[in-house]
Regions:
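A short hydrophobic beta-strand segment most commonly corresponding to one strand
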Residues: 109-114, 139-141, 155-172
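Conserved metal-binding segment of the jelly-roll/cupin
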Residues: 132-148
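C-terminal interaction module
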Residues: 175-201
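Asparagine-centered strand-capping/turn motif at beta-strand->loop junctions
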Residues: 149-154
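Non-heme Fe(II)/2-oxoglutarate
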Residues: 1-79
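A short glycine-rich, His/Asp/Glu-containing loop-to-beta-strand
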Residues: 75-95
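A short beta-strand-loop-beta hairpin characteristic of the jelly-roll/cupin
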Residues: 115-135
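Short, conserved beta-strand element in jelly-roll/cupin
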Residues: 92-94, 103-120
């Protein structure tokens, strides 16, 4: 089962950071998510995903862009990755945190890493025993229908732009969690690899 694919677009990461930080600083959000697209009501809060792909929202109908993003570099980058995006959001994961291991009801997501420090923050697929980091300037397709988590081992927030293919339909497969010991095991192994690389570097 394919878990991810990397695309090298050579995005202007400094310009992306500037636009993303402007949105975050001007629109505080306790949920650490900012909706760049909306379904019915404009704004950065109305279409955030608090259920993390659980099917609580029809994500493929979230296709309208907030008007101030009309000529933005963010929007330009998203359309370079995919011609039919939906549910585009900025997501922030605080330092030292990770998402619960889960399965999304939508089969895949596209990711544009904005603030990231590989290999210290990374996707983890415990069931498949796979870890991978995302690099600035690139974009990624991620199979979120597989058990996955995201781990931020950096002493700063991790910030990504994330969106769907609007043609992707919700799958009724129930969300499930995986025993945390499986996640801890591969995180420990990943830390050992990082330490070895730094030691020999």
């Amino acid at each position: 089962m394919k878990l991810y694919k990397e695309y090298n677009f050579n995005f202007d990461i400094d310009l992306l950071k500037k636009e993303v930080l402007k949105i975050i600083s001007n629109t505080k959000n306790v949920h650490k998510q900012w909706a760049l697209q909306y379904s019915k009501i404009p704004g950065y809060y109305n279409d955030v995903d608090l259920g993390y792909g659980s099917g609580s929202r029809e994500e493929n109908k979230i296709t309208n862009w907030n008007e101030e993003l009309e000529n933005s570099y963010i929007k330009e980058c998203v359309y370079k990755v995919h011609p039919n995006p939906s549910n585009t959001r900025i997501m922030l994961l605080n330092l030292g945190q990770c998402y619960p291991t889960h399965v999304d009801g939508y089969r895949s997501r596209y990711q544009i890493p904005v603030f990231t420090v590989p290999p210290l923050d990374y996707f983890a697929f415990p069931k498949d025993k796979v870890i991978f980091s995302m690099y600035p300037g690139k974009a990624y397709w991620v199979n979120t229908h597989a058990y996955h988590s995201y781990v931020n081992g950096v002493e700063a927030p991790r910030i990504n732009i994330i969106f769907n293919d609007a043609a992707d339909e919700f799958d009724e497969t129930p969300q499930q969690t995986l025993e945390h010991k499986n996640l801890r095991k591969i995180i420990k192994k990943h830390k050992e690899i990082i330490n070895e690389v730094h030691h020999h570097g």
